[in-house]
Design a protein with these regions (language model features):
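Extracellular (secreted or membrane-anchored) zinc-dependent metallopeptidases
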Residues: 1-61, 67-202
Length: 202
């Protein structure tokens, strides 16, 4: 699970909430962090061709992507519904696909054949492929912000641009910042009318 970043006014980005001018950052009651379930922390694939859908290295990279402003690479509405053909990650260079339909097929496969544990298996070769919901074309899943069976070893150019923008401007994200034109405080003795709301995503 990860918290999405916050951008201080006047900085803005599609899909990212703003801290309004005059806000006190000390009034944020929610942790700005990434959390990994320790049930999976030791789940690392074995051998050169080993594979696990809950690989902790990929999971951590994925959750850090959310922390730095990235949405899932598949179609997902704000209410969590994945049975959609809407491209919802604010990056036009990530091919969209209907995750609900994909999951139905994958679940049926796993129920009948069991876990996919090798990148050379027929199951991996079949389910690493996706169908673009806009064009109908097949593509290989390589994006770290995808789920399930995926190479999970790449970000796109637009995803990298989003991350750079967040690194340069977001509050609660470590590093040097450009806060030109912003107006917020971090003093413990002042209050503001702005209220933080949680923005968690898995």
């Amino acid at each position: 699970i990860a918290q999405f970043p916050w951008l201080p006014e006047p900085f803005e980005m599609d899909g990212i909430s703003q801290v309004k001018k005059g806000a006190n950052l000390n009034e944020n009651p929610y942790p700005q962090c990434v959390s990994i379930n320790n049930k999976y922390i030791y789940d690392i694939p074995k051998g050169a061709n080993g594979y696990s859908m809950s690989n902790v290295v990929v999971t951590l990279s994925h959750e850090l992507g959310h922390f730095l402003g990235l949405y899932h690479a598949f179609n997902q509405l704000l209410n969590g519904n994945t049975n959609s053909n809407e491209d919802s990650d604010y990056c036009t260079d990530t091919p969209p696909y209907n995750k609900y339909r994909y999951d139905v097929a994958l679940t049926n496969y796993l129920t009948y054949y069991g876990d996919i544990t090798s990148t050379t298996s027929d199951g991996y070769k079949e389910f690493v492929m996706r169908t673009n919901s806009k064009t109908g074309e097949q593509f290989r899943s390589t994006n770290i912000m995808d789920y399930a069976v995926s190479d999970a070893n790449a970000f796109t150019t637009q995803q990298a641009e989003r991350v750079k923008y967040i690194l340069h401007h977001a509050v609660f994200v470590p590093g040097p910042k450009d806060y030109t034109g912003t107006d917020f405080t971090t003093t413990r003795n002042s209050t503001s009318d702005f209220r933080f709301t949680p923005q968690f995503i898995e």
